[in-house]
From Swiss-Prot:
It catalyses: gibberellin A1 + 2-oxoglutarate + O2 = gibberellin A8 + succinate + CO2. The gene is GA2OX5. Expressed in roots, leaves, culms, leaf sheaths and young panicles. This is Gibberellin 2-beta-dioxygenase 5. Binds 1 Fe(2+) ion per subunit. Pathway: Plant hormone biosynthesis; gibberellin biosynthesis. Catalyzes the 2-beta-hydroxylation of several biologically active gibberellins (GAs), leading to the homeostatic regulation of their endogenous level. Catabolism of GAs plays a central role in plant development. In vitro, converts GA12 and GA53 to the corresponding 2-beta-hydroxylated products GA110 and GA97, respectively. 2-oxoglutarate binds at Y198, R281, S283. Fe cation binds at H213, D215, H271.
Length: 341
């Protein structure tokens, strides 16, 4: 089945569910229409350099995380054939009728794994025009063998190992950090893969496929198999810039926890996805997270206590604060809640 050949019954009822928010449409049009978005070239890190020119490769990665908060990696070790197979499985499951996605255990996942729209949205600017499967790494396997499910698990494992390697490089790359530096310990129980689909959005200015946000993890890895449908944008120098899709690379971005741990050396950059008026977009994202009890505190060898920009907090405390803010305001406030200077 071609990607543009789908039954509209597979789409979540976004327009009818959130019609009460569309009184804000004129303001969204004006806000988005005033933004001139240029296309950017993200820094590209060839991970083959870790074997051939290790120090140069590590320095390039540290520079990209500091200056951009985003970078692409090539020769990352995740087979392209596996990523294509994941994309095909992703397209197939999102093609299923909406009612099946919300009620049945597709691919052996509970219906609660399927999410769509933004239930907490209080205005149109907070609505994400998307649907997704949120898949924790430790999700129990189904009793029957499902090839697509096995592919998801293979990709999750490969992404977890890659993300751990990249996070360690960045942690050890901070000024004053050495081989004895204490690392933030990650846990499979809190890491997850998210399969995204952004349906076509017929609103005048397209709308947000995913609202502007930063990631609440240590590190995120994103892949998009399509090379013809863009949409990912990040904030650079006070302006939104568009990221050109590249199926052969993986996009890596710094999360809030790594920004806090690095004492603002690395940047968790605000980013968003713009929905397309006529084309659907698919992507995959892996989120590297620590245990809920892990203490995030910028007081390791590279930071004196008096110079710390944040008070110490656990990942569990951070998540709880975010959920409270989203419930009360409709949006995430994030690191500002924990900043001391």
């Amino acid at each position: 089945m071609e990607e543009h050949d789908y039954d509209s019954n597979s789409n979540p009822p976004l327009m009818s569910t959130y019609k009460h928010l569309f009184v804000e449409q004129h303001r969204l049009d004006m806000d988005m229409g005033a933004i001139d978005v240029d296309e950017c070239e993200l820094p590209v890190i060839d991970l083959a350099g870790l074997m051939e020119a290790e120090q140069v490769c590590r320095a390039d990665m540290v520079r990209a995380a500091s200056e951009w908060g985003f970078f692409q990696v090539t020769n990352h070790g995740v087979p392209q054939a596996l990523l294509r197979e994941l994309h095909d499985a992703q397209v197939a499951v999102f093609r299923r009728p909406f009612q099946e996605k919300v009620t049945e255990r597709l691919l052996g996942f509970s219906p609660e794994s399927y999410r769509w729209g933004t239930p907490t949205a209080k205005c149109l600017e907070q609505l994400s025009w998307s649907e997704a499967y949120h898949i924790p790494m430790t999700t129990p396997r189904p009793s029957t063998s499902i090839r697509a499910r096995a592919v998801i698990e293979e990709v999750s494992r490969a992404m977890y190992e890659l993300a751990q390697k990249l996070a360690e490089i960045l942690m050890r790359g901070l000024p004053g950090a050495g081989e004895g530096e204490t690392m933030v310990t990650t846990r499979e129980e809190t890491c997850f893969l998210r399969l995204n689909r952004y349906p076509p959005c017929a609103m005048a200015m397209g709308g947000f496929g995913l609202c502007p946000h930063t990631d609440s993890d240590l590190l995120t890895i994103v892949h998009q198999q399509q090379d013809t449908v863009g949409g990912l944008q990040l904030l650079k120098g006070g302006r939104w810039v568009a990221v050109k899709p590249s199926p052969s690379t993986l996009i890596v971005n710094v999360g809030d926890l790594l920004q806090a741990w690095s004492n603002d050396v690395y940047k968790s950059v605000e980013h968003r996805v713009m929905a397309n008026a006529t084309l659907e977009r698919f992507s995959m994202a892996f989120f590297l997270c620590p245990s809920y009890h892990t203490l995030i505190i910028p007081s390791s060898s590279h930071v004196h206590d008096d110079d710390a920009h944040y008070r110490s907090f656990t990942f569990g405390e951070y998540r709880k604060q975010i959920m409270e803010d989203v419930r009360s305001t409709g949006r995430k406030i994030g690191l500002h809640r924990f900043r001391t200077r």
